[in-house]
Amino acid sequence: MLYSLLYGYFNINLFQYLTFRAGLGFFIAFFLTLFLMPKFILWAKAKKANQPISSFVPSHQNKKDTPTMGGIVFVFATIVASVLCASLGNLYVLLGIIVLVGFSFVGFRDDYTKINQQNNAGMSAKMKFGMLFVLSLVVSVLLSLKGLDTFLYAPFLKNPLFEMPTMLAVGFWVLVFLSTSNAVNLTDGLDGLASVPSIFTLLSLSIFVYVAGNAEFSKYLLYPKVIDVGELFVVSLALVGSLFGFLWYNCNPASVFMGDSGSLALGGFIAYNAIVSHNEILLVLMGSIFVVETLSVILQVGSYKTRKKRLFLMAPIHHHFEQKGWAENKVIVRFWIISMLSNLVALLSLKVR
């Protein structure tokens, strides 16, 4: 909106620069989240929209009165900042907003069910995965129709591994959406544990998206160019800004949780950025914390079903370390450090090819 008005109509050249509009979007989303979140917290407490706490984690029972669904606020702030600062005629921007809203809506349904039933179960797995699958499939098909190439790239290599057939690519992208959204959802179990790794991952992906959309940088760095994708940089930075605003209230001890409304939206948008920038494989490194958390659950369930033995004291693995006596803050900060280092290594792949 501001972009179309100030650059398209008044011809203010400053608004033609992605970096300026992305920075502006960052601060708009940050301050809007800071402003709206206290009001949301008061409303959520009045409505008793509190996060049901699992009985298997007795140390978290003191969090039972903490309101949830804070993700609605930072998703809303991101959309407002994107509408103001990004070009809404860009399909990658529109699809990014659709991903944020769609995945957040599924998360909202799950949160609402948990609050109504006063347990941690939420929607049935069949309904939840069904809704996520349909949404992921629609976005993946639209990306294919847009003409996004289907080459599969590996980090630190100049050339793609191979070109996927269209149907295989769509199926692969759906898998990336589903796995990433649920991985972030599993990670969101401690104060700030999902927020900061998401910030690191989004910052890294934002750089890749910016390079992919810039003809000179992509040529210099031997990075695959994706026409028009650079505009998504504005939306990504807006989401990072809103996450910093959310973290202001989510740091330990948290005043609000993001809920599935936030974690599914984050995971879906991270997956979307990875797909359009051809970083599906590198996402394993950038989202290392999410991968480890998910693997711990898979291994725990698999081990118990096959051997009747548990590999960890509790899964996801952040609870395992809590059971071993680590303070919550120690688990959180150490996971942040791992995430930061993983993303620094991932960024090296831009130059080391």
From Swiss-Prot:
UniProt-annotated location(s): Cell inner membrane
PROSITE patterns referenced in this protein's UniProt entry, alphabetically: MRAY_1, MRAY_2
Organism name: Helicobacter pylori (strain HPAG1)
Family the entry assigns: Belongs to the glycosyltransferase 4 family. MraY subfamily.
Name of this protein: Phospho-N-acetylmuramoyl-pentapeptide-transferase
Gene that this polypeptide is encoded by: mraY
Keywords: Cell cycle, Cell division, Cell inner membrane, Cell membrane, Cell shape, Cell wall biogenesis/degradation, Magnesium, Membrane, Metal-binding, Peptidoglycan synthesis, Transferase, Transmembrane, Transmembrane helix
GO cellular component terms, A-Z: plasma membrane
NCBIfam families recorded: mraY
Cofactor(s) demanded: Mg(2+)
Keyword Cell membrane: yes
Entry membrane topology: Multi-pass membrane protein
Domain of life: Bacteria
Short name of one Pfam family: MraY_sig1
Enzyme Commission (EC) number: 2.7.8.13
